[in-house]
């Protein structure tokens, strides 16, 4: 498992543009190596800003989007097309503007879908989706995602794994239903930390002074039960991509000069 690497940008806007450029390079490299790439998307202000920047990135055309397998790290369990669904926001920001293969866009079920208002069934279904997508070389029931994009909440949650919640203790399942979330909407579906840790690279992105304490705790050695984002690690690389405000309380020994 990789150790966290911190990269700080002056502003959130610069961070989103830099992450978009970095992501183009990573996807192109993956496609050159094996013909396809896999990416886990996230929601939230920063996650969607990255997708918007990606849409207009100068090297955007270098990515063959028909050969990108897309997943979600978590989803708000709401009806199809609801504006608060991560899928809806990702489609508006990027996916409706590029030539994706619909069969490779693996969304989490909506609350008006085939499983009705049953997030546990939706979670079990997405676990099956992941298992079906896993290759023999992945050595398990979760694909080895090239990049898993994640946000970080003010209290240290990532995906929809919240501090001291049942999800943070999960060690067997790759996807779980999350009820009674402290942030609305209260019901969600989320990858677990063990599933996230199957990723080759995990990129945690966050901005703003309200995140500074959680970021500092995660990078300062807090456990994942207290700060779930601390448990999100990639097999080969773990990046903490921050703006100056979010990095304000990180020990100076961990923070390089501004990118």
What would you call each of these model-derived segments?
Residues 194, 200-259:
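ATP/nucleoside-binding phosphotransfer catalytic cores, i.e., glycine-rich phosphate-binding loops
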Residues 2-3, 63-146:
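Ligand-binding beta-strand-loop-alpha-helix segment within the catalytic cores
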Residues 41-46, 150-154, 207:
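Glycine-rich beta-strand-to-loop/alpha-helix junction loops that act as flexible
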Residues 1-39, 120:
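N-terminal glycine-/serine-/threonine-rich phosphate-binding loop
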Residues 31-58:
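Glycine-rich N-terminal segment of FAD-binding domains in flavoprotein oxidoreductases
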Residues 59-69, 98-100, 167-169, 194-199, ...:
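Short, conserved loop/helix-junction motifs that constitute active-site signature segments
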Residues 53-64, 88, 92, 163-172:
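A glycine- and small-aliphatic-rich helix-loop capping segment at beta-alpha/alpha-beta transitions
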Residues 147-194:
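Class I SAM-dependent methyltransferase SAM-binding "motif I" and its flanking Rossmann-like core
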């Amino acid at each position: 498992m990789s150790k966290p690497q911190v990269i700080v940008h002056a502003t959130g806007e610069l961070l989103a543009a830099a992450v978009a450029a970095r992501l183009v390079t990573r996807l192109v490299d993956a496609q050159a190596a094996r013909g396809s790439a896999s990416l886990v998307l996230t929601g939230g202000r920063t996650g969607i800003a990255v997708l918007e920047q990606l849409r207009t990135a100068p090297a955007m055309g270098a990515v063959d989007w028909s050969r990108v397998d897309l997943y979600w790290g978590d989803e708000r369990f709401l009806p199809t097309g609801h504006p608060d669904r991560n899928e809806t926001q990702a489609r508006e920001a990027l996916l409706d503007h590029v030539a994706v293969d619909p069969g490779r866009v693996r969304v989490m079920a909506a609350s008006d879908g085939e499983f009705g208002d049953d997030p546990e069934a939706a979670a079990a279904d997405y676990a099956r989706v992941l298992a079906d997508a896993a290759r023999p070389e992945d050595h398990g029931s979760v694909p080895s995602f090239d990049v898993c994009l994640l946000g970080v909440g003010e209290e240290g949650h990532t995906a929809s794994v919240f501090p001291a919640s049942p999800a943070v203790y999960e060690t067997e399942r790759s996807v779980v239903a999350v009820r009674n979330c402290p942030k609305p909407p209260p019901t969600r579906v989320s990858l677990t930390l063990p599933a996230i840790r199957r990723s080759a690279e995990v990129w945690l992105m966050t901005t703003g002074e309200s995140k500074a304490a959680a970021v500092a705790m995660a990078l300062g050695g807090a456990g994942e039960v207290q700060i779930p984002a601390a448990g999100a690690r990639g097999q080969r690389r773990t990046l903490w991509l921050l703006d100056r405000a979010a990095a304000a309380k990180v020990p100076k020994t961990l923070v390089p000069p501004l990118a």
